[in-house]
Amino acid sequence: MRPRMICLHATEANIEIIDREMKEMPFDIKHEVDTHLLSMIRSKQPLELQKAYVVEQLNKLMLQEPALLFVTCTNYVALLDEINVTTHIPILKIDEVLYEQLKGIHNPIKMLFTNKETIRGTMQRFRQFVSEEVEVE
């Protein structure tokens, strides 16, 4: 039996891409779509409620005992960083690989977003990974 990777998404948009790009990976992939966090952000619920919700959802996912949790929602990723979550199960955050590759770029970078609600969290995390000298349009 192959180990299981849970992919946590805010929408179904990434499922097909993940399945296609990770078909050779040695994992069985289980997708979990959670739209509620985006609803909480849209309705401007207090940050502490959002953090508590993320912890609750993370605990539910960990009960499934995956080998790996892959988080594709940058809002989830940003909140995970704010709550300093620790778990025995590795959590892979979708943006970290990209940010590592962008560290050495000296030309302006153009970032395009398909979801305006992910801009704040994505840019905060981006600035943590790269130097302030990187110009973003």
Predicted regions and their residues:
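Non-catalytic structural scaffold of enzyme domains
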Residues: 1-137
